Each structure stands twice: as C-alpha cells, then as structure tokens.
C-alpha cells in the first residue's frame, strides 16, 4: 500500500527480532501526521467527540502531569475515533502573562543588560513575540513525542488574533451587562513584580516568627473590666499599626463588651479609632483584642466592610512606607475621615525595616507588653519569590454571583458530571462562596484591557478606540489613553472551549464540536479554570432554543504524580523525572546536571546528587513511549495521587517485548501459510474456542472500564489477557496442533491466531499506539485487510456468540490440572523438563471426559510420560497430591527425589527465612525507626515480613509432605 509507513519493511519475512521503540516511534508519528489521520473525519452524520487540551504555558516544557493527562486524553480520543465518531482533539498554548514576561525580561537582562523599561512597551512586546517564535514551540514538539493524535492544523494560542477578538467581545458584553466593573479592593500584591496576582500564584510557607503584644491606650479615661486603661492587641505585622482604623473584640467577651462603642488612641499616630464588637475576635485566642487594618489584611477588610470603617493604605506599590497615607471610605472613595499623616521617622522605610522601627518605638514608649515566638504561614509570590502584600488597588472585576448560579445548576442537574463524583463537593463549596474575580494585572504581556480614559478620568469601554469614539461622539480633539493593564490569563483560558472553535463567528466547527465531550484536568485548578469556563461558556453560548450551553459534559479529575516515596515532584527536592527521559533514556551524568544545574538553592545540590546516584546508579534506560503510556494508564486510579514506580515502567516495557515476541511467533506460524482466508475446512480446537471466548469477555470488560474512565482497570485487563491468557497459555496450547494437527485443524488454529492477534492490537491501540500500528501493518494482510492504518479501524465489539461456556470451563480445568503439576514440581524441586507419571484419583464423570478428550494436550503441556485415571477405590502409590475440581492429582514420589537430601535443603531454607524474619522484627520493634522512616519504607518492611512468614509456612508444609513419604 502506498500509505504504509515507509520505515516498516514489507519485504522482510517477519518482524525484527528485537522490539526497538526508538526506531519505530518517530517515523510512525510523522507518517500519521502527514497522512492527516488526526483530523476529524468530517462526517457530521456521525456523533462528534471533542476534547480541548488544557493549554500549557508557552514557556513550559513537558512534565509528568502533562504526560499523565495527555495519555488519558489521547487514549479517549483514539478509542472514540475507532468507534467511527467525528473526533477533534485540539491543542494550544497559553500566553502565560507573568511567566513569559519574566522569561524574556531575564533573557534581555542577561544578554543585553537591559530592562523592559529601556525597550518601552511596544518594543518589549515585539521582543516577546520574537521569543515565542523561537522557543514557544518546545512543549508542542514534546507533545508529539507522546504519540498524541492532535489535529495540529487547528493549534491555537491564547494571544492569536481570533482569540484576542473573542476576549474583547466578552469583556465589552460583560461590561455592558454591568458584570464587569472597576473598583478599589484588596488584592494579593507582588511588590517585586508590581502586579496583582491570583491565589494560585501564592505559595504559603511555614515560618518561625514573632507575635508582638502592643498596648493601645483607652480614650476618655475608660477602663477594662480588670481596671486597665489600655487594651493589648497581638499582631505578627506591627508595621501595619500605622493603618489601623479599629480594634475588634468579641461581643460576648465579658472583659471588653462594655467598651464596645468607645475608642482607643492609636500609638505613634495619635488618631482615635473605635472599639467594635465582631465575631472575628476570638475570646480564646491571644488577648481577645484584634487590631483592624482594612487596607492591609483580607480578614480585616471584611470586618471593615461590616462596620463601614475607613481604609488607610500606608504602602507604596514597592512595599515601602508612603510619605502620606491614602484614606478611603468603605466604597473606595477618597475621604478625609482620618488624617493622612504618617510620622516622619517611618516615611520611605522598606516594610520590614519599618517593622523593626515601629517595634522599637513601642518599646521606647513603654507600650510593648511582650514578644512571643510564633509559628506562622507567610504568603510568597511563586514567581517573584517575595512576601505578598494585601494591597488596596484599583482593579477590574467580574461580578460572579449571577454567573455562578447557572454554573452550579448545570452540575446539580447532571448536565456536567465530575469523575470521580466527590469533586462535585469541592466545586460546590467554592462556587457557593464565590467572591468577585479580579481580572486585571499590572503587566505588559497579555490582552490589554479594552478601556480608554479621557483627561477627566471618564472610562469608555469598546472593542477598539474607533468604536469608543463613534459610540460616545468623541471627536479627535478629545485625548484618550488606553488602560495600561492586561487581563488575567485565566480570563482568556476561561473562553477556551468556544473561542478556539471560532466564536463569536457562528462557525461550522462551533456547531459540530460544542459542547465538547470531556475535559481532563488536575483538581488544583477546578476553581481557577474549570469553574470559570463553565460560568463564561454558559453565559455566552446558547443552543438553538436559547438554553445555556455547557463547555463539556464530563470533567475527569486527575491526582498529582508524586515520587516513589509520595513526595511532590519539585526542582528544589531534585526528584523531578522528565517523561521524555523515560522514553529515550538518560545517563546519570546528564540526569545529575538536569537536577542540580541552575538551582535557586545551590546548597541542596549535594543531597540531590546522593539521592539521584542511589536511585539511578546507571541513569535511566530507554523504555519507549508505549511503556510510559501503559504505566500512566495503569496507575490512573480515579482522582487519587499517584506514587511513580519505575518498576512498573520496566514491567510494561517487558509487556511490550512480550507482545512483540508473541506477534513474531504468530507471524512465523502464519505468513505464507493457509490461514483459512480463502475457504477450506476449518476445525477449531478446544484452545481456539477457549481463546475466542476469553477474548470476547476481555473486550466486554475492557470497554466497560474505558466507558467509566477506569483506565487502570482497562490496562490491567489488557495486561492479564495478553500476558497470561494469550501468550502464556494459548500460544503454548497451539504447539501440539502446529506439530501434528490435520490440515483443517492447522487452518482453524492459524485463523484463530490471526483473528485474535489482529483484534487484540485494535483493542490495545488507544493505550499503546506505536507498537500496535507497527505489528498490525504486518498482520493486516493475513486477514485480508487493505486499510492504511489501525487508527481508523473499528474498535472490537463484544460478540456473545463467540463465548463458548463449555470451552471456558473445560480449558480452565485443564489449566488448573497443569498448574497443579507445575506447583508440585516447584515445591519438590523437580526439574521442569523431567517427564512425570501422573494419576487422577476419584475423578468424576466431567473430569474423566475432559481427560479423555484432551489427554495428549495435557501430557504435552505438563510434560508427562503418562496420565492415568485410577479405578474407583484404587488409592494409588505414595504420592504428592493436589486437588482440582472433581479429582485429585497424584505424582508418585518413588525415585523422584532423595528424601534425606531434600529435607536437609528445606531445613537450610527455613533457617535462612528465620534469620530474615528476626532482622525485620527487630527493625519494626525499634520505635525510633518506625517514627522516623518514611511511611512507604515502613510499609515495605511490613510487606517483606508477611512474605517471609508465608514462604516459611510453605516450606514447613513441604517438609511434612516429604517426611511422610
């Protein structure tokens, strides 16, 4: 066929001897992409199926989380494509505001010694586009390596022209509907990057700090219940005293409730501030009095709103003390309710220097009661790396409550389903307590806010300046300046499912593929991305009846991939594994360089080096993409975090080898032979009928697992059938036929070999696409298939007529009998190749029939010299026995083993196990080890102890058996 992948040599007599993923994967992917197999089939009469990849940051490179989620998505897409659906899997990247701006700022600083301000806004943005052209494609190149069958011609970028138009359209419409407004509120402020940031970009770190107890004198001669003329407030941030506008006490607190409504004199500043009754003050905590600084603390901001307190901002955007405070009322309007004076000695101080100066002044005035050590959680910016400051700023907000109502109902009424279901509760708890969303960022890179200001400060919103002038009758003489801010990247990615299909145009793609079918995402962004997509999509997308349209019908949530000890993978821990290093392999030297080069904390390098050398003394072997994908699927138990396991990866690499070698065996016994394709009598052996029945049951179970997103079960079902039933049993069971079967029997077995292998390759294809396509290209001709690719072949369907119950039960019995013989060989240390005499005692009619019909079969596979049915009442000679259904298997021991030698050997084995059991029990009895060692290490020791005890018990049973001979 002209469309056969060029690297697959059709003239070779069979598959290469060894499975070499490095040689087959990349040429095959290039072939698939070139042939256009990843595109939708365009048949709109067929059901459509669509997944949008969560857009990774354009600055990023592929990590295990991406590999995990994309394996799941590609498995789903390939599975649905093979069922004939019109499938679209669309990819794209996110412009990643802060991350990208910082990458390019660092680049120009390192290469040119310049800042973005040296360039100016427009030139700096050009520089970013230039960088994107050179480096922005890294992650999509890596995605191709995973075998992702993405329609690359439809790849999108959140800043491309179509998406930028959609973003403006959404902003303008929401503003017209009063769902976007500008307001002065408290935000997470990064003083280094000088921008508002989202909660997701805040990293909370545990820290040892202090709690300062400060005295605030009561005004007008008031006294506490204990007769003191001051209140003591406890704070971890004394510098914010300068911005206090109240002191809260619990209204039920007997010590202070009579003081509610009175005032204190704020030290250092001298202003009178009220004492308020508010539940925020906890009677049991600290002194029971809480200073309220609405402009510098999120909780205080809420208290301030409840009591209409003014807000006093004492910090600049750099985090220094202002020379004059800004005073606002609860609505963010400037007010002169309080003086804006800040004592001269604090003006211009950096915030942490101000902290020391404020404490020193309190001490000097005799108002520092005490200082206690205190464990606290400090918010840091995950990119700037400095302490985040709650800051009162003018920002743009989305009024979310009306949008959230519809989005909650969509999940409540089942239009959107979460897998696993328990994540619905997380979604509800966030959505029912939703705050307005701050969507502006003080950056240059991003979607610039489509708002303009005249010289009087009036705001005009429109798609562009020309529209603003036209709609508001503003002549050329009116000077307008565009808002400097850009939109939060989550705003544009919130439109991802419909903007990427051409909205606001009513495109064919939008009609065909929206709503999309499923979104695969990590639970950490349910609120930041999933919930916002649901809110925005349902507001803008309506079906033909005007009903809000959901962005997707299913949300599949994944857990995190952790290291083998359950630790989160991070650069600072040095435990990150690059998925492509497991595909291609990496030397120890290169791995160490990757893990310890360019570290933010170089002092950790030695520890990381030791750990890496211990874990990967020879680096990482190449395993190929299919083995990686199989491992990821097998570990995907819904919604749970996964501890990565290199042993599993090796196991699935061995699985691919096993499938390759089994296929070579099939091809060697069928290529150039009569496989019954052209008629001729066919007789199916019991083994043929059994494997067809087993395979159909496998299809049924596998499809059920896939349809319920149980990729772990699907992978297990595939592994069990392929390795245990097909390779270990069926291929062995075909050998007697191949050696001495009639023409009709040979035809039947060859036909079955091809039929099952070809369908098995289709079944496995969604999870392991490369190896299955490669083998299928060899197998298809034997089945008379002329199609070009396995990707577009029909997915196997369950066929009840192929399930021969008698064949299943008969062969299961034969297997149990053979296993019984093999177990006796192993237990008695009898060589596997030594022919044995076997007898069946007390066989019922069913067992007798099975022996008589399949005697040569059983003898050949169990390597028996004879198989005898003992007459009723015949006890037979002294033997080792095993029970099977309806009979007892006897192997006479006379002459097979030297009793004394064997008992001596077993005694030594038992002694060895006793020593190991004693060692482990000693370790587990050591309280220090159990308390200090990681949980996973302790669990491994316990498992080892149980395994040793079980092995010892088996040896003791063997001793008893041999002693009785």
Curated annotation (Swiss-Prot):
Q: Which ranges belong to the motif 'HIGH' region? A: 56-66
Question: Where does the record place a coiled coil?
Answer: 896-965
Tell me yes or no: is Coiled coil among this UniProt entry's keywords.
yes
Q: Where is this motif: 'KMSKS' region?
A: 568-572
Query: Molecular function (GO) terms listed?
Result: aminoacyl-tRNA deacylase activity; ATP binding; valine-tRNA ligase activity
The protein's predominant localisation is cytoplasm
Q: What is its EC number?
A: 6.1.1.9
Recorded catalytic activity of this chain's protein: tRNA(Val) + L-valine + ATP = L-valyl-tRNA(Val) + AMP + diphosphate
Give the keywords, sorted: Aminoacyl-tRNA synthetase, ATP-binding, Coiled coil, Cytoplasm, Ligase, Nucleotide-binding, Protein biosynthesis
Binding locations of ATP: 571
Q: Show the SUPFAM superfamilies listed in the entry.
A: Anticodon-binding domain of a subclass of class I aminoacyl-tRNA synthetases, Nucleotidylyl transferase, tRNA-binding arm, ValRS/IleRS/LeuRS editing domain
**Which GO cellular component terms, listed alphabetically, does the Swiss-Prot or TrEMBL entry include?**
cytosol
Which PROSITE patterns is this protein grouped with? AA_TRNA_LIGASE_I
Note the superkingdom of the native organism. Bacteria
GO BP annotations of the record are: valyl-tRNA aminoacylation
Compartment annotation: Cytoplasm
Q: What is known of its domains?
A: ValRS has two distinct active sites: one for aminoacylation and one for editing. The misactivated threonine is translocated from the active site to the editing site. The C-terminal coiled-coil domain is crucial for aminoacylation activity.
Q: Which family does it belong to?
A: Belongs to the class-I aminoacyl-tRNA synthetase family. ValS type 1 subfamily.
Q: NCBIfam families, alphabetically? A: PRK05729.1, valS
Q: Which PANTHER family match?
A: VALINE--TRNA LIGASE, CHLOROPLASTIC_MITOCHONDRIAL 2, VALYL-TRNA SYNTHETASES
Kindly state the subunit structure of this protein.
Monomer.
Its annotated function is as follows:
Catalyzes the attachment of valine to tRNA(Val). As ValRS can inadvertently accommodate and process structurally similar amino acids such as threonine, to avoid such errors, it has a 'posttransfer' editing activity that hydrolyzes mischarged Thr-tRNA(Val) in a tRNA-dependent manner.
Protein name listed in UniProt: Valine--tRNA ligase
Q: What is the lineage of its organism?
A: Bacteria, Pseudomonadati, Pseudomonadota, Gammaproteobacteria, Enterobacterales
């Amino acid at each position: 066929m002209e469309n056969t992948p060029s690297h697959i040599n059709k003239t070779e007599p069979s598959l290469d001897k060894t499975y070499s993923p490095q040689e087959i994967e990349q040429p095959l992917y290039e072939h698939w992409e070139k042939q256009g197999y990843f595109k939708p089939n365009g048949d709109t009469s067929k059901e459509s199926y669509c997944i949008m990849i969560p857009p990774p940051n354009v600055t990023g490179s592929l990590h295990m989380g991406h590999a995990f989620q994309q394996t799941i998505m590609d498995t789903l897409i390939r599975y649905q494509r093979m069922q004939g659906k019109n499938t679209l899997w669309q990819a794209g990247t996110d412009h990643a505001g802060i991350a990208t701006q910082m990458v390019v700022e660092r680049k120009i600083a390192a290469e040119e010694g310049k800042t973005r301000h040296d360039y100016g806004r427009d030139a700096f943005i050009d520089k970013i586009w230039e960088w994107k052209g050179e480096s922005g494609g890294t992650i999509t190149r890596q995605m191709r390596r995973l075998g992702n069958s993405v329609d690359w011609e439809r790849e999108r970028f959140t800043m491309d022209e179509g998406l930028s138009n959609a973003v403006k359209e959404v902003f303008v419409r929401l503003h017209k509907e009063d769902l976007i407004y500008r307001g002065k509120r408290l935000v997470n402020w990064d003083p280094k990057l000088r921008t508002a940031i989202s909660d997701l970009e805040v990293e909370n770190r545990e820290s040892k700090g202090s709690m300062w107890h400060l005295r605030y004198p009561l005004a007008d001669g008031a006294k506490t219940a204990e007769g003191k003329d001051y209140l003591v407030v406890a704070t971890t941030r004394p510098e914010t005293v300068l911005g206090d506008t109240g002191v809260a006490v619990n209204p039920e607190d007997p010590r202070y409730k009579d003081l509610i409504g009175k005032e204190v004199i704020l030290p250092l500043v001298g202003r009178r501030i009220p004492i308020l009754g508010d539940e925020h003050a906890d009677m049991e905590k600290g002194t029971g009095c809480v200073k309220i600084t609405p402009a510098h603390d999120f909780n205080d901001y809420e208290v301030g709103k409840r009591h209409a307190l003014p807000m006093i901002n004492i910090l600049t955007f750099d985090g220094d003390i202002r020379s004059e405070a800004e005073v606002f009322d609860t609505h963010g309007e400037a007010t002169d309710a309080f003086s804006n004076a800040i004592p001269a000695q604090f003006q211009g101080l950096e915030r942490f220097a101000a902290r020391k100066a404020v404490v020193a002044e309190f001490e000097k005035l005799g108002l520092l009661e005490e200082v206690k050590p205190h464990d606290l959680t400090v918010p840091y910016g995950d990119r700037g790396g400095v302490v985040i400051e709650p800051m009162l700023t003018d920002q743009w907000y989305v009024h979310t409550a009306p949008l959230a109502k519809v989005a909650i109902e969509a999940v409540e009424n089942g239009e959107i389903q979460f897998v696993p279901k328990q994540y619905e509760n997380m979604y509800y708890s966030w959505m029912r307590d939703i705050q307005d969303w701050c969507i502006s960022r003080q950056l240059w890179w991003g979607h610039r806010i489509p708002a303009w200001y005249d010289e009087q400060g009036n705001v005009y919103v429109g798609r562009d300046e020309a529209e603003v002038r036209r709609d508001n009758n503003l002549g050329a003489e009116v000077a307008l300046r565009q808002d400097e801010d850009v939109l939060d990247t989550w705003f544009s990615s919130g439109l991802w499912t419909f903007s990427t299909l051409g909205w606001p145009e009513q495109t064919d793609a939008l009609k065909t593929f929206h709503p999309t079918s499923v979104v695969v995402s990590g639970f950490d962004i349910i609120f930041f991305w999933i919930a916002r997509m649901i809110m925005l999509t349902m507001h803008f997308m309506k079906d033909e009846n005007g009903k809000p349209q959901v962005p997707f019908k299913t949300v599949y949530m994944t857990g995190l991939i952790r290291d083998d000890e359950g630790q989160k993978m991070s650069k600072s821990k040095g435990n990150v594994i690059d998925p492509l290093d497991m595909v291609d392999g990496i030397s120890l030297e290169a791995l160490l360089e990757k893990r310890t080069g360019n570290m933010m904390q170089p002092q950790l390098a030695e520890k990381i080096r030791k750990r890496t050398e211990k874990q990967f003394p020879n680096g990482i072997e190449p395993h190929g993409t299919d083995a990686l994908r199989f491992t990821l699927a097998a570990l995907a138990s819904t919604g749970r975090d996964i501890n990565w396991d290199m042993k599993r990866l090796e196991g699935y690499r061995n699985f691919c080898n096993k499938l390759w070698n089994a296929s070579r065996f099939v091809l060697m016994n069928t290529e150039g032979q009569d496989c019954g394709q052209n008629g001729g009598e066919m007789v199916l052996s019991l083994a043929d009928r059994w494997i067809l029945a087993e395979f159909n049951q496998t299809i049924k179970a596998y499809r059920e697992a896939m349809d319920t997103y149980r990729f772990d079960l699907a992978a297990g079902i595939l592994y069990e059938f392929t390795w245990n039933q097909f390779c270990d049993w069926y291929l062995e069971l075909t050998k007697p036929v191949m050696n001495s079967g009639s023409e009709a029997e040979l035809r039947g077995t060859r036909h079955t070999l091809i039929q099952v292998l070809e369908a098995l390759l289709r079944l496995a294809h969604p999870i392991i696409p490369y190896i299955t396509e490669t083998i299928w290209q060899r197998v298809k001709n034997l089945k008379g298939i002329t199609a070009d690719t396995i990707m577009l072949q029909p997915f196997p369907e369950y066929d009840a007529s192929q399930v021969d119950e008698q064949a299943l039960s008969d062969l299961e019995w034969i297997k149990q009998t053979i296993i019984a013989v093999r177990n006796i060989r192993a237990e008695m240390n009898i060589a596997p190749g030594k022919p044995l005499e076997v007898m069946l005692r007390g066989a019922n009619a069913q067992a007798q029939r099975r022996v008589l019909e399949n005697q040569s079969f059983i003898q050949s596979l169990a390597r028996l010299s004879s198989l005898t049915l003992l007459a009723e009442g015949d006890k037979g000679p002294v033997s080792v026995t095993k029970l099977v259904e309806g009979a007892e298997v006897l192997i006479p021991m006379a002459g097979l083993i030297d009793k004394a030698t064997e008992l001596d050997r077993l005694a030594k084995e038992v002694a060895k196990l006793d020593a190991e059991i004693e060692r482990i029990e000693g370790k587990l009895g050591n309280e220090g080890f159990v308390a200090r060692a990681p949980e996973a290490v302790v669990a491994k020791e316990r498992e080892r102890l149980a395994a040793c005890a079980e092995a010892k018990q088996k040896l003791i049973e063997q001793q008893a058996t041999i002693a009785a001979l």
